């Protein structure tokens, strides 16, 4: 086992604080509308240029092991905030640095770190309550666009395209971000439920222009096994033919005699039918078939529930207004399922999302929710170069997370103003314990840090601006984009409540851990000079009688 260095007390905290400052100073230059870029080296290819706090934090690894521990703890603040709220990583880092900086002064002066921590926790609970009281629900498309713009470093085009996407697919719909082919951002919307399976035979195509099969007002047969024998299908086909309506068959596989008969009937015009494979694999396939059944108001024909193909009636089949089947995708538009059933299914999947342990499972479950809730929007990010594309894409993803957070918990005044107003509301908070009160006091001072940093990055004088904002009321704050004061909500400078709340809670949590640290154990640096010399390669060859 390698030798370890153990460092105690003030020296341990001082080294950790140095690490915190190095990381936070690199991250905080990106804060605000006039925040700067940070360039990140890549082991191959062009460097990455970013204004995303968590991207900067993730790149930082310090040489000094004790400093690095401090840096890694603050990196955790940024990552955790990003995971929960999807934005606010720079604000969280700035708050953590401010709480550590103020707190380490008190600890150095001899105050009890555990009492300080209790005070910090009480202050955070009170501030979060005030933020919730000040929160305003986001109702309009304009507010959603403003939140998106602020998160994307005041890029209005990003806010607008996200608001448009939410208008089209609803606030629960899936919105994905992809690389575009042009210089401009584009929005592509797929209405209804789409899954990645196409027709099993090109002979099903009835729209040669689009190379797709379009079924108007069709029935939908959902079967969880393979269909090879046409005899099993005949009762269903006869009933559908009598109703003079098209049929979509979704099964694990349709092949052999069954597929050949369906193709022949389609070509002869006897029956309009299309067969596709069921989406997904294993248990996920069963779940997705059940989703389609609920969306279309049908049943999954499965032996487990006592249903067989021979006994299927029209009441067991799903229905939709229109279905489009391409080579690789099938889209079900306006399924006939009951709204209450769809809502119940969505709730059920949401519970599974909360319980899911892997990111992959969570992502797949979220896709299912979106498909049931009403569509998929794809934002295609346009840029001139690959480097710009990466930077822009990261900003659009941040903005998307921020708007989702705003829809979830509402909005507060942006630009650090919400925290200052919360500070004013809890200014008289006291516990009767002087050391805990010191913890409360240091948090109330630290919440000024985001506004101070926004002003500093804009080239202003932080103390002057903070005093001016504290003298105002309500949403009165400082717009760093054009150096003016006014109502932040009217100026469209908004922050999602969830982002501000999460940033404060995570910053205080990690800062408290740092302040209550009394010893640090790290691997001792290896002494390079003590390494043994390499053995000589040609020793003993001097006397060769030359």
Curated annotation (Swiss-Prot):
Disulfide bonds: none
Superkingdom, taxonomy of origin: Bacteria
Binding site for ATP: 30-33, 51, 87-91, 415, 479-481, 495
GO molecular function: ATP binding; ATP-dependent protein folding chaperone; isomerase activity; unfolded protein binding
Location of the protein in the cell: Cytoplasm
Catalyzed chemical reaction(s): ATP + H2O + a folded polypeptide = ADP + phosphate + an unfolded polypeptide
UniProt-listed Enzyme Commission number(s): 5.6.1.7
The entry's keywords: ATP-binding, Chaperone, Cytoplasm, Isomerase, Nucleotide-binding
A GO CC term attached to the entry: cytoplasm
InterPro entries the record matches: Chaperonin_Cpn60_CS (IPR018370), Cpn60/GroEL (IPR001844), Cpn60/GroEL/TCP-1 (IPR002423), GroEL-like_apical_dom_sf (IPR027409), GROEL-like_equatorial_sf (IPR027413), TCP-1-like_intermed_sf (IPR027410)
Main location: cytoplasm
One annotated GO biological process: protein refolding
Coiled coil: none
Sequence intervals crossing the membrane: none
Extent of Gly residues compositional bias: 536-546
Residue numbers spanned by region Disordered: 527-546
Similarity comment text for this entry: Belongs to the chaperonin (HSP60) family.
Quaternary structure note: Forms a cylinder of 14 subunits composed of two heptameric rings stacked back-to-back. Interacts with the co-chaperonin GroES.
HAMAP family listed in its UniProt record: CH60
Task of the protein: Together with its co-chaperonin GroES, plays an essential role in assisting protein folding. The GroEL-GroES system forms a nano-cage that allows encapsulation of the non-native substrate proteins and provides a physical environment optimized to promote and accelerate protein folding.
Protein name as it appears in the record: Chaperonin GroEL
Organism the protein comes from: Acidovorax ebreus (strain TPSY) (Diaphorobacter sp. (strain TPSY))
């Amino acid at each position: 086992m390698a030798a370890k260095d153990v460092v105690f007390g003030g020296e341990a905290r001082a080294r950790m604080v140095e690490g915190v400052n190095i990381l936070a100073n690199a991250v905080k230059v990106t804060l605000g509308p006039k925040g700067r870029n940070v360039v990140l080296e890549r082991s191959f290819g062009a460097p990455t240029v970013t204004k995303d706090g968590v991207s900067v934090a993730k790149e930082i690894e310090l040489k000094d092991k004790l400093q690095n521990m401090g840096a890694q703890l603050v990196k955790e603040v940024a990552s955790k905030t990003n995971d929960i709220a999807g934005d606010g990583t720079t604000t969280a880092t700035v708050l953590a640095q401010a709480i550590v900086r103020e707190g380490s002064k008190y600890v150095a002066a001899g105050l009890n770190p555990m009492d300080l921590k209790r005070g910090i926790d009480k202050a955070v609970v009170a501030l979060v309550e005030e933020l919730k009281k000040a929160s305003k629900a986001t109702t309009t498309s304009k507010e959603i666009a403003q939140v998106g713009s602020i998160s994307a470093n005041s890029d209005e085009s990003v806010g607008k395209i996200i608001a448009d996407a939410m208008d089209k697919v609803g606030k629960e719909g899936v919105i994905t971000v992809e690389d575009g082919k042009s210089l401009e951002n584009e929005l592509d919307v797929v209405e209804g439920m789409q899954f990645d399976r196409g027709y099993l035979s090109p002979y099903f195509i009835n729209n040669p222009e689009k190379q797709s099969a379009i079924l108007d007002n069709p029935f939908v047969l959902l079967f969880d096994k393979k269909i090879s024998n046409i005899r099993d299908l005949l009762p269903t086909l006869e009933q559908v033919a009598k109703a003079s309506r098209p049929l979509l068959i979704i099964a694990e596989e349709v092949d052999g005699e069954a597929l050949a008969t369906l193709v022949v009937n389609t070509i002869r015009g006897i029956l309009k039918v299309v067969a596709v494979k069921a989406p997904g694999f294993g248990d996920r396939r069963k779940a997705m078939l059940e989703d389609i059944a609920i969306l279309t108001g049908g049943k999954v024909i499965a032996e487990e529930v006592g249903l067989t193909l021979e006994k299927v009636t029209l009441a067991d089949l799903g229905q939709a207004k229109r279905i489009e089947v391409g080579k690789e995708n099938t889209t079900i538009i306006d399924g006939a399922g009951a709204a209450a059933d769809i809502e119940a299914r969505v709730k059920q999947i949401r519970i599974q999302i909360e319980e899911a342990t892997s990111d992959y499972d969570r992502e797949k479950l979220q896709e299912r929710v979106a498909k049931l809730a009403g569509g998929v929007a794809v934002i295609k990010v346009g840029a001139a170069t690959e480097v710009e594309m990466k930077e822009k894409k990261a900003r659009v993803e941040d903005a998307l997370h921020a708007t989702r957070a705003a829809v979830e918990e509402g909005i507060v005044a942006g630009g650090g103003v919400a925290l200052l107003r919360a500070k004013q509301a809890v200014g008289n908070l006291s516990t009767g314990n002087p050391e805990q009160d010191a913890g409360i006091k240091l948090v109330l001072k630290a919440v000024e840090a985001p506004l101070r940093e926004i002003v500093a990055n804009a080239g202003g004088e932080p103390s002057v601006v903070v005093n001016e904002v504290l003298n105002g009321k309500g949403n009165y704050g400082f717009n760093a984009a054009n150096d003016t004061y006014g109502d932040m909500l009217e100026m469209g400078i908004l922050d999602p409540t969830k982002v501000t709340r999460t940033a404060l809670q995570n910053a205080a949590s990690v800062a408290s851990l740092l302040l209550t640290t009394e010893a640090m154990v790290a691997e001792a640096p290896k002494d390079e000079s003590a390494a043994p010399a390499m053995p000589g390669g040609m020793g003993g060859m001097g006397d060769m009688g030359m």
